[in-house]
Amino acid sequence: MVPPRRHRGAGRPGVLSSSPPFRLRSAKFSGIALEDLRRALKTRLQMVCVFIMNRMNSQNSGFTQRRRMALGIVILLLVDVIWVASSELTSYVFTQYNKPFFSTFAKTSMFVLYLLGFIIWKPWRQQCTRGLRGKHAAFFADAEGYFAACATDTTMNSSLSEPLYVPVKFHDLPSEKPESTNIDTEKTPKKSRVRFSNIMEIRQLPSNHALESKLSRMSYPVKEQESILKTVGKLTATQVAKISFFFCFVWFLANLSYQEALSDTQVAIVNILSSTSGLFTLILAAVFPSNSGDRFTLSKLLAVILSIGGVVLVNLSGSEKSAGRDTIGSIWSLAGAMLYAVYIVMIKRKVDREDKLDIPMFFGFVGLFNLLLLWPGFFLLHYTGFEDFEFPNKVVLMCIIINGLIGTVLSEFLWLWGCFLTSSLIGTLALSLTIPLSIIADMCMQKVQFSWLFFAGAIPVFFSFFIVTLLCHYNNWDPVMVGIRRIFAFICRKHRIQRVPEDSEQCESLISMHSVSQEDGDS
């Protein structure tokens, strides 16, 4: 057996051996392996962190939408309570002072109190004192184009997309090595390095929402640019006044129709016909949608029909005096329901976001225009004989003022805010909740007993309100249409012949590809 050949000087003392370089090289390889392992573990941890952050962010965005919906529902329920108390006070006033036009005019004119905000609220005064529109005409032209694009967008998301966290992949640059290997590495100064985050946040900006990116590149002073940014998202006082001028007539006619119906017809008939505002809102919102929550679905239609059926049962349980129905009062009720639906659908289409419109300023101008433009109606109604002008006594006047401040000024502001937070259909269906609540108030305060029809009708009214809320919350989910499609697909299904695994002749190729290739080669 031949011994292995040894290198010269191998194993001798005082002579350089070749084993230390091999050890250094193996140590270097092991260090590289440990570094790769450390980087792999770090990448895995980053991916876990990214998953957790994205999950939390999606939950937060869903929580924000749920919080808006919950706040809107609470506000609408509070409005129902206020309206029930207001209706009780209105019934007392009509027993002593049956003047629908005067009552509606007085309550609507109280909206002028909101215009005191120009004295108290500084941003409102700045819109009048500062010439922003003349000074920055081009800027506001871009802003109007931006908001016009927003108005045509039917989606709820009018800002940046939800953040997405992605790990950053740094490309390692080749390290600079010294030319001479004899230079001592300990004497070379260490270069200072900057640590960057290993996770980057990505947000996408829609093309029609790119005004903010243009504002960030403008050369205005910081304070001036900040003030413009605060006011550009809001409608100016002139624009709010124009919107109020149009909607003041619709709102006044809707309330006047309801008051006239109450004076001509029984309350039960008025409430039954007024509940059709939900149906008018559903139809108008489908024709003139303001957002994705106003899309027409079959489930919403059935919920509205369910609500109307419940209202009919509730009113039948509350009163049996239905023999003296007046046709004029029924027409007034239907007109009021239709005008109320036009009012809420058109204003949501005109103003797509609640932060774009100053709701107190809007109602303030509504009261101002009603006070300035509709006072000739007293002379017209007085000389035609429809309603004689008569000033009320102190008690009735105090009741009208209290009812106007709480039941009209405050409640209309809260109701419109709740409609912006939820949807126009939910806001109109919330009106139907006042009927069972008013009957409950009569049971508690006046000790009135109702039949089983009341309870049979109150349950559908409450259920329809919360059903539509859930349908709008879950992105216009239409379970009724889904069920109909599945039933139709089940009935119209075709019996298909399924392949049996044991039938080998069905899987056998009729033309052998190998034989075909051989014939092509021979030819």
Swiss-Prot record:
Disulfide bonds: none annotated. SUPFAM superfamilies: Multidrug resistance efflux transporter EmrE. The modification Phosphoserine is found at residue 207. The keyword Cytoplasm does not apply. Its main location: membrane. GO terms for cellular component: membrane. The chain crosses the membrane at residues 69-89, 101-121, 243-263, 268-288, 296-316, 327-347, 361-381, 395-415, 420-440, 452-472. Keywords: Membrane, Phosphoprotein, Transmembrane, Transmembrane helix, Transport. It is a multi-pass membrane protein. The keyword Transmembrane helix applies. Residues 252-316 form the EamA domain. It is found in: Membrane. Putative solute transporter. Belongs to the SLC35F solute transporter family. PANTHER family: SOLUTE CARRIER FAMILY 35 MEMBER F5, SOLUTE CARRIER FAMILY 35, MEMBER F5. This is Solute carrier family 35 member F5. It comes from Pongo abelii (Sumatran orangutan).
